[in-house]
């Protein structure tokens, strides 16, 4: 390079660009005094905190600054909490081969085209988004050279690669038109798919070597992990209802991973001496949220059975409020009364998704094999009535159903599953009607998950309840198909009777309760499941009558059931739900 004066306006460059020019040209170019001063000032700004331990400065354990290969020695850690994140990620590692995407094809072919279109767009964004993240996180290995940081980032890189392959497997299995698939995956470059393009563009801009703020890049990564995927996870995990098991299981794993990624970068942000101001962090969170809201509006068409736009939008905003809480800044979104906005989606109630257990399989998606326990004091959102309902329902199940809750069972699991089952019932307006799958089998599948092995499945076996040292027998059926036909007959009778009610008369509520009670009592008589019939019936009854309560007096509850069997009178049973 010739020793000529550099021809550019240094005042228009970012500090990062100035520092690069300094390192590249300082010994090869002739600088004017003014140019040298600008470069020198920029360099001082960038290196102001370079002696901080987080950026590789000397510590009591490391007498010298961190060198290029010092991460070969992982101990002692300067920040043990960051090392713990890496250890946790290692212990949670999994492989794409654990997810059989093709097993969902039969269900995929049964859902509506609107639902398929919604899922395709979400999967396409995830495939691109995870690729982008994997490509960009190397930046943080340079910015945070500590061994514990590099260790986590190494694991995250592998982790994101697994995510990328899983989403590609989903797309390959579920989208047979490969030309359309190519267009979908390239949507981030097409203005026609503006919300997807805007998300990818924003992420590419904020997490970039051209960004002159190390702190803003970390906030951008926080937004990526905790906000930019919020609507997508809420959509895909809702498809547990039609039993797309591979789709749900894979996204439970991935959401768990992204939660850990978020917590790592949130902790990194907390430790940074040059952390952006709370106001600037809030600005970036708001930018990311508004882009995610556009995506939520775009990706969910009308007529998608399991998702509504208004609930999804509220969830995205509430999710950002929780991110604010975990970053120790003020919430951003409020309702019309000035209260902090909370998520209406209980199944997405916490960023701590490591607490979740998969809905379908015996394999847990939490990080280790320690006994699963939920901190209900920190449940998000704190729906007090729902938790009270679950407390009462867990209690009545224990005293009425006996062996359904053994002493060895973790009751917190039961309580969480009851909350999830209630949210499932509440998340779609069936207009008072009952559906074999949605209302009955799904509720039992969720409520009894990890309590019995055949949750959600009818059992035509020998069933009885022990009451006062005596056995109460239930009908037996030669085959499950005959049993299912009997239950379907009850459902058809209920739907017919409910539809015939005059909704305009004053006594409609009383008539509705009477019809619902008769259906529930007849269902209890048939006893279609091997266990958990009472729990399931009480959840459905509370939903049908619109009152979140459950009976808690064992003797009176049982008497009301037998009173109906002897007299056909439902009033005593109804009274159990109106105390």
Curated annotation (Swiss-Prot):
Gene3D superfamilies: Fido-like domain (1.10.3290.10), Ribonucleotide Reductase, subunit A (1.10.620.20). It holds the Pfam family Fic. The active site is at residue 167. GO terms for biological process: deoxyribonucleotide biosynthetic process. Binds 2 iron ions per subunit. Its EC number is 1.17.4.1. It is an enzyme of class 1 (oxidoreductase). One of its GO terms (molecular function) is metal ion binding. Fe cation 1 binds at residues 130, 160, 163. Residues 435-579 form the Fido domain. Keywords: Deoxyribonucleotide synthesis, Iron, Metal-binding, Oxidoreductase. It catalyses: a 2'-deoxyribonucleoside 5'-diphosphate + [thioredoxin]-disulfide + H2O = a ribonucleoside 5'-diphosphate + [thioredoxin]-dithiol. Ribonucleoside-diphosphate reductase holoenzyme provides the precursors necessary for viral DNA synthesis. Allows virus growth in non-dividing cells. Catalyzes the biosynthesis of deoxyribonucleotides from the corresponding ribonucleotides. Belongs to the ribonucleoside diphosphate reductase small chain family. Heterotetramer composed of a homodimer of the large subunit (R1) and a homodimer of the small subunit (R2). Larger multisubunit protein complex are also active, composed of (R1)n(R2)n. This is Ribonucleoside-diphosphate reductase small chain. It comes from Ostreid herpesvirus 1 (isolate France). The lineage of its organism: Viruses, Duplodnaviria, Heunggongvirae, Peploviricota, Herviviricetes.
